[in-house]
Amino acid sequence: MHPRQLKNDHLFIIPKSIIKLLAEMEKQYEDNNRQYFENLLNHQNYIIRTRAVCILADLAGEESVKYLSKVLEKDANALVRHEAAFSLGQLGFSTAISSLSRAVESDQSFFVRHEAAIALGVIGSSKARTTLKGALVDSSEEVRQSALVALANLKYISTMKRKNKFTTMTGG
């Protein structure tokens, strides 16, 4: 056995049904079928929901904010919520600030709180400043650091009086 191989690697085999569904998702993506991906946000498998979040953000733009915000607030899986926060940040619409702020303030996963803080910084609105300052005392060092990264970006945007591609590349 290779030293990095898990003893129970048979438990991590991806079912053929998931691979088949990913192929169907690719077809639906090529057809720009937003409704299909909106429906997949409720799929039982987190792998599918994670992909659906990213694809819906790409296909629907600002119209996806309401769906991604719901995922951020309600999905049971932290990875899916993290991807929703990331996608909302990349989209950059101020309509996502409320749900991202709630995630920073109360999500049970530091992983999600961290990404939501970064996303607020990417969006670049001063409306997020209070939430980000509150995150400076979060129990998680990663969240505190992410809040500082986001606050630095807000300060840079206000100093330069512009938002551009550079200001969306905060890392995190």
Residue ranges, per PLM feature:
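Amphipathic alpha-helical scaffolding segments comprising HEAT/armadillo-like alpha-solenoid repeats
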Residues: 1-9, 27-42, 61-74, 93-106, ...
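Alpha-helical segment of the N-proximal tetratricopeptide repeat
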Residues: 19-27, 36-42, 46-59
